[in-house]
Every structure is written in structure tokens, then in C-alpha cells.
Amino acid sequence: MLILLSPAKTMTGTSKIKAPQGTTPRFQQEANEIALHMTQFPIDELSRILKLSPKLAAECYRRYQDFHAEDKQPLQAILAYTGVVFKNISPKDFTEEDFLFSQEHMRFVSGCYGLLRPLDLIKPYRMEFDVKIPELGDGNMYAFWKDRQTNTLIHDVRQGDRILLNLASLDIQPSFQWKEVERSVRIITPEFKIWKNGKAETIVIYAKMCRGQMSRYLIKNRISDPEALKAFTWEGFSYKESMSEGDNWVFLQE
């Protein structure tokens, strides 16, 4: 079973957490090219295309200017991302075996690096899939990655039991030939809902927390049977058979 996760917007370039030796991203050449073209954008343009405050745009500008600097060391992706999902994966207590298990059973979808493994070494960046870089063609980053990474994802899922645990947000799907992925492997998509105002609602922050916690649960317990995921509970969230349909599994907090 392979976990698919969205990247985080917040990142760091340093960590005190000890992890196994990093690996080279499989689309490193593409990432280098993207980052090189991003250096041409001034701060105000980065603010516009990435929808950033002036302060964050300035930070983004510095990061792209430093992207190819040899004195700026990359960091394993699972440590570099610091958003809500990754805080809840909480790799600070991972053993070497946990990291290695995650390397085989987890993938992140990056607008700059493409499909990433947890130990792939990356540098901080900021990217949105709707960004257009003229030198890379007429389309945006969705178009850039769609054909490049689809077969890589399918191959990675088929290396195991042909089951993809889709814990990514909907907005990453257009970066793949998603219909082809659906035809090629089984996709299980958990949904995390809260009972509010007489109905089940998705609250984004809680959904992100649960995605991270479920990923951690799978890694720490070495889960390979998807049925075992139905035993996942966290902060009152639990699997609801009556609300689930097919491979769309609902976990409800009542």
C-alpha cells in the first residue's frame, strides 16, 4: 500500500532529527530547471503569481536565488516539509526502520520536484501548480508534470500490492493523468468528517491532521492490509461503514 500526500507550503532547510542517508529525487533535473527559471521573477511578481505577502515573497525570492548554491545543503523531504500534515506525521521519534518503511510506502506530490520519496533530498521552495513558466511551454505546472510523473506513480504502486492510499488533497490530481491511475491501481480515499449542525462536514484543518495521523499510524504499525486501516482512531475519529461507499472511506468525529 502506497500513501500519497500533498506537499506543505511551509518548509525548513534544517532539522535536528537524525534520518537515514538521503536519496536523489527522480526528477532532480526538472526541479533544477524550474528553480532556475523561477530566479528570473522579481519579488513583486512572485507575490502575484504565488499569492504571497511581500514578506513571504521576499523569502521565496531568496530561496530560489540560493537553490543552486552548493553551500546550502538539502534535507530529506519528510523533514523539510513542516505543515500540519507533516507535524502530525511527527517523524521526530521515527526509528531508522520507520524512515525506511516510509521510503517504500509514502510519496509526496511537489510542484517543483514532482513525485517525491520521503528521503529524497530537497531544498526549500514555494510553488503552486497553476503557475506558468514561459520557458517550460504554454501550460502551467499541472501540464508540465502530468505526463512526466503519472507512470512513475503507477510503477511505484505496482511495486507493492497495487493499492494507493490517497491522502492528498483534490488539487493534486490534475498533475497526473488521474483517469489512467484509476484504471491501473486500486485507490482508497479516506475522508475525515465532523458531525456539525446536524450533518457531516469536512473541516480542512482537522482533515489535514487526520491525514498526517493516519500516515503515522500506517508507518508505525507496518500496516499492509488496507482493512486494518479501518481500526484507525484519533481524537474521536473512527471508521463509519454506514457512511462509506466502495473505496471512499469515511472517518467521523461525533
Curated annotation (Swiss-Prot):
Organism domain of life: Bacteria
Residues in the signal sequence: none
Record GO cellular component, one term: cytosol
Alphabetical GO biological process terms: response to hydroperoxide
Record-linked Pfam families: H2O2_YaaD
HAMAP family in UniProt: UPF0246 (MF_00652)
Family recorded in the similarity comment: Belongs to the UPF0246 family.
The protein's name: UPF0246 protein BDI_1226
Species per Swiss-Prot/TrEMBL record: Parabacteroides distasonis (strain ATCC 8503 / DSM 20701 / CIP 104284 / JCM 5825 / NCTC 11152)
